[in-house]
């Protein structure tokens, strides 16, 4: 078969985010493994570009305060970013619309950013955050402004299943 005949075939595409996030499908879950690497690499790249050190350092010349890192999104990439930043000695804050993420974030030693109370209860679908209303997004941005203005590094990992990632900054 020639290359031109192969190119004319109709190719089938499947969105990898539609694979179920269950243990039986774990061997096919390439998104989680790639997200894990992305979260790790994001912190390493940020640390190499930052004009200061991540951990607190006490020297004869004085004390260098630890870097402050804000991670937006507490999924696979976000949790890996938290773990990596904490291992490097940073103070880490995390924002996610899913209340269940708070426990995971705190178990890694990060501080969870409490979002404003609204009538809408954001949730998740298949392990991903659901889309929220523009009103909620506006209130979320207002809450994050304080944390982001004090941060040395911001890592954005927030995703919505089947949609464009939310613009939080």
Question: What are these model-predicted stretches?
Answer:
Residues 17-23, 97-99, 117-118, 159-160:
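Short, ordered loop/turn segments at secondary-structure junctions
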Residues 17-68:
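Phosphate-binding beta-alpha-beta segment of Rossmann-like dinucleotide-binding domains, i.e.
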Residues 1-7, 11:
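Single conserved hydrophobic/aromatic residue that forms the stacking wall/gate
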Residues 151:
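An anion/phosphate-binding loop that grips the pyrophosphate of nucleotide cofactors and donors
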Residues 56-147:
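Glycine-rich phosphate/diphosphate-binding loop of Rossmann-like nucleotide-binding domains
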Residues 1, 159-168:
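Glycine/threonine-rich flexible loop motifs
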